[in-house]
Amino acid sequence: MRKIAVITGSRADFGLLRSTIDAIDLHPDLDLQVIAAGAHLLPPNHTIENVRSQLRVDAVVEMQRSEVFGRTADAVAVGRGVSGFAAAFERLDPQVVLVLGDRIEAFAAASAASIGGRILAHVHGGDRAEGVADEAMRHAITKLAHLHFAATQESGERILRFGEPPSTVHVVGSPAIDGLDEMPPLDDSQHAEWGRPTTVLLLHGAGLPSATERRWADVAIEGVRGHGPVAIIRPNQDPGSEFVDQAITAAASEPMIQVLGHLDRPTFVGLLRHANVLVGNSSAGLIEAAALGCPAVNLGPRQAGRERPASVLEVETPDVQRITEAIEKAIAGKFEGGHPYGSGGTGRRIATLLGESRLEVSPRKRNAF
């Protein structure tokens, strides 16, 4: 049995990784290990309990501290994470460590795996996301990784240009598409309890100056007024999100606004199925919403450089009128073409590749420059 340690560090990556986790668990030649870390341990959501309610968690790695925010705090958290992951890998002894994306939890785990001589597999490498500081970490993880599970053809080609051997690069689609067809709309009673929202706002911190983060949040909330009822989902733990959260709290008592905390993936998808538009700066606007046929209005620089379908409209400056106009255009629009992120089945493809009898990868990296 080949031991595969899957790293989850947040509510977002857990939802994306779930299909891969399930496929690994069902594979007869793979032994699943789950390591939960980082933002899962932070209040107020403390999403580690959500993970534990669904899966056996084999190790927990503390990284961030809830009372400290910012890039310096993140750097300290990475150091804490490298140490914690190294200890977990020593105890669990996985043959392969699997990470997704660009967050500091993935970067810390990738660093510990690479230095510790373990095979590293990376999902969603090669993507561009110039609007966040984590862009550099995504590409750093790519250079540490031995196996690459790219979400799009363009991302796969970018990984090859990094000098990674072609035999290690697999275009498998995005796991964000997996299972969408099986997730129904939110049930009517829950939808009614939340005011039957037709507009969803999901805005995360983008690592911008505090005044700019708050300005974006204020104009975003002002922009969705009049397109309600509105569901506003509280942000993740990215730098700057505390200023977004302050603006959301200030608007929480308004009668046409329903503020929601952590939503698991099926509930979030069920909410989107009722929505006319998703507004914000989450990658869900580019991937899940597009796959569901829900147009999106992307705000600010956070998703800059990422591949996107025609159903995503851009607002590059914090301007209420431009946001309002983009929402109206999105709701009225008929958008041609699909999206570049595949048609599902990504988790099964990843598990199949991990379970191949000859995993022809050496922990000693070889570039193809």
Task: Tell what function each PLM region has.
Residues 7, 15-16, 25, 63-166:
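Active-site and donor-binding regions of nucleotide-sugar-utilizing enzymes
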Residues 30-74:
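Conserved nucleotide-sugar phosphate-binding/catalytic loop shared by glycosyltransferases and other
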Residues 99-100, 107, 122, 148, ...:
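A donor-sugar binding/catalytic signature common to diverse glycosyltransferases
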Residues 192-245:
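Conserved catalytic-core segment of nucleotide-activated headgroup transferases in glycan assembly
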